Amino acid sequence: MTNNMNNYPLLSLINSPEDLRLLNKDQLPQLCQELRAYLLESVSQTSGHLASGLGTVELTVALHYVYKTPFDQLIWDVGHQAYPHKILTGRREQMSTIRQKGGIHPFPWREESEFDVLSVGHSSTSISAGLGIAVAAERENASRKTVCVIGDGSITAGMAFEALNHAGALHTDMLVILNDNEMSISENVGALNNHLARIFSGSLYSTLRDGSKKILDKVPPIKNFMKKTEEHMKGVMFSPESTLFEELGFNYIGPVDGHNIDELVATLTNMRNLKGPQFLHIKTKKGKGYAPAEKDPIGFHGVPKFDPISGELPKNNSKPTYSKIFGDWLCEMAEKDAKIIGITPAMREGSGMVEFSQRFPKQYFDVAIAEQHAVTFATGLAIGGYKPVVAIYSTFLQRAYDQLIHDVAIQNLPVLFAIDRAGIVGADGATHQGAFDISFMRCIPNMIIMTPSDENECRQMLYTGYQCGKPAAVRYPRGNAVGVKLTPLEMLPIGKSRLIREGQKIAILNFGTLLPSALELSEKLNATVVDMRFVKPIDIEMINMLAQTHDYLVTLEENAIQGGAGSAVAEVLNSSGKSTALLQLGLPDYFIPQATQQEALADLGLDTKGIEEKILNFIAKQGNL
């Protein structure tokens, strides 16, 4: 992909923020137009995150124009909105490789650029890291500034408020920018608010404010009166949220128009030299400047390749995704059981819960980006006699590990975890791979862990987890299902596997959706294939039988080898005194980079060809070809 840079005369001059800072202020609106158009052209040809970046064009330009990056430290939360940042910081020509194997990362990444201060991917980490960076700069007597940009979704997480509370207490110099692209927080945006933001962020006001405080500290009654007067002024002139952030110890400014580049530059210029923790609330529109994305910001959040002229996203007419299989199952259950409750931490669309939320609104809860709360909320529902189902990505369940143990498992409560995006996820890379859930759940007492090999198995396992009366987890991958026939729901026998094919010498013990590769290989190798179904409790009887009747056992899973399902098999063999040779195939001990799912599996030797080579090499090493 190549963009015709003749269409972008100003942007073509910008190879770093230093180039940007050479422009006159009156050139910035044109640069924003070009940057937005370039972003649309690039992402439409490569796929990626679009709507968020379209909404932060003016903010990104203003930040790099006012702050002396990379000396000043700019931290993006999550990173979906950081595509314009990448374009302005020397990676414009590499945008055609974003989210692709060997290409630039979909999120800010420290190893990629000195302008990427913090590697991100998960939400709500920016303020905590930013505070640490600001404290370090303060202790080194560095004059650098620290700026954190966080969205209105990410700031709902408890970790963000923990960091705000700590920052206010430390009174460290830093700026937190709330990029508010929803109508729910505040609609007070206009000329008056922009003007007031300039006043309250200006050096004259801040000097008078700080000087008065030093004097009035000696006269507590007057000091308290003036503090309440200032809070009242901000509450009236700005928004109700100002009081919250002021109480946390921040000087609140806003909301201001996040698409008015002149006002942003003026406000940020004022705020750059303010002391103590500062909070700037800006209002933006997700998808700004591209009508289809403005109309459907959720649909255009992450997009495949598409035609930007028509604005139509390609439809997927292939087999249903595992997320849809889950969503359909949840609706089917809710039709019969008013006590089933669906819970998601801000992943309604991704987890396949749109239809459920519309048809059963009283049984649906989106708790926002609050994974810890989601799990303990489910605990309370289970105690109250309901049947909670927590739909959560594998990578995000990591954020609620203590709640999984302390609140669910210890009390042995019937909470079902529908774990989406388990295994290799593809283009989002290391921060989003579902590589660890089997390992970190398998050691928890009372847990039932199931690994479906196709969509029908997935449905049956969800139903089994829903009926079993214990903490249960069903892990399934990102992407399309196999296309098998769906059968009526029935509870599976807990901890029992199913024998798929009988062979000789080699037995492949499959955990999950790599079963087609195992079956294809079994014909070549005359191998036995067992779909293990359950990681915990594991089918000890089947493992011991296979160890007695075969020379080699091979375990197959899309999870880290360390502590994974193969390790469970090794533990059974060890405790039973079996010396059968065991080959554990799974994800290696490093963070797996971005690539398509197929590319990643091939690179890891977990496609059919790679599995065959690993098995044959293993047998050769045993001296029995």
Swiss-Prot record:
GO terms, biological process: 1-deoxy-D-xylulose 5-phosphate biosynthetic process; isopentenyl diphosphate biosynthetic process, methylerythritol 4-phosphate pathway; terpenoid biosynthetic process; thiamine biosynthetic process
This protein's UniProt keywords: Isoprene biosynthesis, Magnesium, Metal-binding, Thiamine biosynthesis, Thiamine pyrophosphate, Transferase
One annotated Gene Ontology cellular component of this protein: cytosol
Family: Belongs to the transketolase family. DXPS subfamily.
Role description: Catalyzes the acyloin condensation reaction between C atoms 2 and 3 of pyruvate and glyceraldehyde 3-phosphate to yield 1-deoxy-D-xylulose-5-phosphate (DXP).
Reaction(s) catalysed (UniProt annotation): D-glyceraldehyde 3-phosphate + pyruvate + H(+) = 1-deoxy-D-xylulose 5-phosphate + CO2
Pathway info: Metabolic intermediate biosynthesis; 1-deoxy-D-xylulose 5-phosphate biosynthesis; 1-deoxy-D-xylulose 5-phosphate from D-glyceraldehyde 3-phosphate and pyruvate: step 1/1
Source organism per UniProt: Haemophilus influenzae (strain PittGG)
InterPro entries: Dxylulose-5-P_synthase, THDP-binding, Transketo_C/PFOR_II, Transketolase-like_Pyr-bd, Transketolase_BS, Transketolase_C, Transketolase_CS
Annotated EC: 2.2.1.7
PANTHER family, per database record: 1-D-DEOXYXYLULOSE 5-PHOSPHATE SYNTHASE-RELATED, 1-DEOXY-D-XYLULOSE-5-PHOSPHATE SYNTHASE, CHLOROPLASTIC
Protein known as: 1-deoxy-D-xylulose-5-phosphate synthase
Residues that coordinate or bind thiamine diphosphate: H80, G121, H122, S123, G153, S154, N181, Y290, E371
Complex and partners: Homodimer.
Cofactor(s) annotated in UniProt: Mg(2+); thiamine diphosphate
UniProt binding sites for Mg(2+): D152, N181
Cofactor notes: Binds 1 Mg(2+) ion per subunit.
Gene Ontology terms for molecular function: 1-deoxy-D-xylulose-5-phosphate synthase activity; magnesium ion binding; thiamine pyrophosphate binding
